[in-house]
């Protein structure tokens, strides 16, 4: 298809715009078209979704269509929407079409990549299953992240999701020399602004790219912004050979945006009014997130569950792609235990002795067993008190309370608020610490010594100070 072909608008239906071209100059599916809004003088990008006959193509706008009218000239760029890639985009905020929105000047990147790209061929993909060490005890022990895997974050407002995300970004940047890409998909602009300011203050912005298509933007932008972020991450993986963390907040909004444009494109809705192409849309995004021989993209996706119904098609389709789930619990946050990760609800497919090793597996299962037994005893304790328990059950409660507190840990990005220096805990230290608690070697150590500690050696030091 020749670049520069010209057509004109023949219909505008909200974010969907119909454009007529000469029959011999029809643009390809997913090509980006450009039209100038006569009211604002701004260039609006339209993405071709369907060829509907008689030279007419149906497109979805990446910006508001207010001011567009029939007869306006439209130019075919001859290529899909492209995103700037490379180190020049680090520390910047972009929109869906790769334009900077942080008022920090133009992005002078040497390359731009199309946002529609095939997933890596099977022969290019890495078949080794490897743990991505995060330095966060509760995650590394109970819900280990596979390198190149997909992790779902579940949690309501105010349970520490953003702080956990920022700590992951910091640890990947400093401990793994990796980069992070954050895709804000259909979330609040205020939250995006707060994240940007917090990243500046905590010093992680320089290793991160932020790509936003927020709640106030048209569905086309919200639907495609995750692909823009993923393309930037793919460059760091494939060209720079890095381990990249890709955060998508929120994957449900990606589905929701697709559902909004689907009916306008004339598609028959499927279950619960979602688009009939739901599984395909999700698959095209998720299959590109993987490890190759050069590097990896590990994706952490916040998942909003509508009306707490996990059978809803949007979250249900997402679950099929996940390798691990991290559930943040308000009950744990209220106890003042951070990160507020629920150790019983969180899980990982790679928590298997064949992958993580026999010792890691047995310690993790031992921790969950003690915590589950403690949870089962809660009702009895509430009615009768701890004194009425059998000696074995008292020992379970005794160790469970120490495990609960040892699962907490101070974060580097929260140092300014807590006054406690952050701790990165290597996986071997995490396993050793919990093994000693399970073996009863620390039964005489006071509970307070375990709270907000890093390694088990730090707990022992604190216990010595308390006794002296």
Swiss-Prot record:
Gene3D superfamilies found in the cross-reference section: 2.40.10.170, Bovine Mitochondrial F1-atpase, Atp Synthase Beta Chain, Chain D, domain 3, P-loop containing nucleotide triphosphate hydrolases
Recorded superkingdom: Bacteria
Name this polypeptide is given: ATP synthase subunit beta
Membrane topology: Peripheral membrane protein
GO molecular-function terms, A-Z: ATP binding; ATP hydrolysis activity; proton-transporting ATP synthase activity, rotational mechanism
Database matches in PANTHER family: ATP SYNTHASE, ATP SYNTHASE SUBUNIT BETA, MITOCHONDRIAL
Reaction it catalyzes: ATP + H2O + 4 H(+)(in) = ADP + phosphate + 5 H(+)(out)
Keywords linked to the UniProt accession: ATP synthesis, ATP-binding, Cell inner membrane, Cell membrane, CF(1), Hydrogen ion transport, Ion transport, Membrane, Nucleotide-binding, Translocase, Transport
Source species of the chain: Thermotoga neapolitana (strain ATCC 49049 / DSM 4359 / NBRC 107923 / NS-E)
Cellular component terms per the entry's GO annotation: plasma membrane; proton-transporting ATP synthase complex
């Amino acid at each position: 298809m020749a670049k520069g072909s010209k057509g004109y608008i023949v219909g505008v239906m909200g974010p969907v715009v119909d454009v007529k071209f000469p029959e011999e100059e029809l643009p390809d599916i997913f090509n980006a078209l450009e039209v100038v809004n006569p009211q604002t003088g701004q260039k609006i990008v339209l993405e071709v979704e369907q060829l509907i006959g008689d030279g007419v193509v149906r497109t979805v706008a990446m910006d508001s269509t207010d001011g567009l009218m029939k007869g306006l000239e439209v130019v075919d760029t001859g290529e899909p929407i492209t995103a700037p890639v490379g180190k020049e985009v680090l520390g910047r905020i972009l929109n869906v079409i790769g334009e900077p929105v942080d008022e920090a000047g133009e992005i002078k990147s040497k390359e731009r990549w199309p946002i529609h790209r095939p997933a890596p061929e099977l022969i290019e993909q890495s078949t080794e299953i490897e743990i991505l060490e995060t330095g966060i005890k509760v995650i590394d022990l109970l819900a280990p992240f596979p390198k190149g895997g997909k992790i779902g974050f579940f949690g309501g407002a105010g349970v520490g999701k953003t702080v956990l995300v920022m700590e992951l970004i910091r640890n990947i940047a400093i401990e793994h020399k990796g980069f992070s890409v954050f895709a804000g998909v259909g979330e609040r602009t205020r939250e995006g602004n707060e994240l940007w300011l917090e990243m500046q203050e905590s010093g992680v912005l320089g290793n991160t790219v932020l790509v936003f298509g927020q709640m106030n933007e048209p569905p086309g932008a919200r639907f495609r912004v995750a692909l823009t972020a993923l393309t930037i991450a793919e460059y760091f993986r494939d060209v720079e050979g890095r381990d990249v963390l890709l955060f998508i907040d929120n994957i449900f909004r990606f589905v929701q945006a697709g559902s909004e444009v689907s009916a306008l494109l004339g598609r028959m809705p499927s279950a619960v009014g979602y688009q009939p192409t739901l599984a395909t849309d999700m698959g095209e995004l998720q299959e590109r997130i993987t490890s190759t021989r050069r590097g990896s993209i590990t994706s952490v996706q916040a998942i909003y569950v509508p009306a707490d119904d996990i059978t809803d098609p949007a979250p249900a389709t997402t679950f099929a792609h996940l390798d691990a789930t991290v559930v943040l619990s308000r009950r744990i946050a209220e106890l003042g235990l951070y990160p507020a990760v629920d150790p019983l609800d969180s899980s990982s497919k790679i928590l298997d002795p064949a992958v993580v090793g026999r010792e890691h597996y047995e310690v993790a299962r031992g921790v969950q067993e003690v915590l589950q037994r403690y949870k089962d005893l809660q009702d009895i304790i509430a009615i009768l008190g701890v004194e009425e328990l059998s000696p074995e059950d008292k020992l379970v409660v005794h160790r469970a309370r120490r495990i609960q507190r040892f699962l907490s840990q101070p974060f580097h990005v929260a140092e300014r608020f807590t006054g406690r220096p952050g701790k990165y805990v290597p996986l071997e230290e995490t396993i050793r610490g919990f093994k000693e608690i399970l073996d009863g070697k620390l039964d005489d150590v006071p509970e307070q010594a375990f709270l907000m500690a890093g390694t088990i050696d730090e707990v022992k030091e604190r216990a010595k100070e308390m006794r002296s």
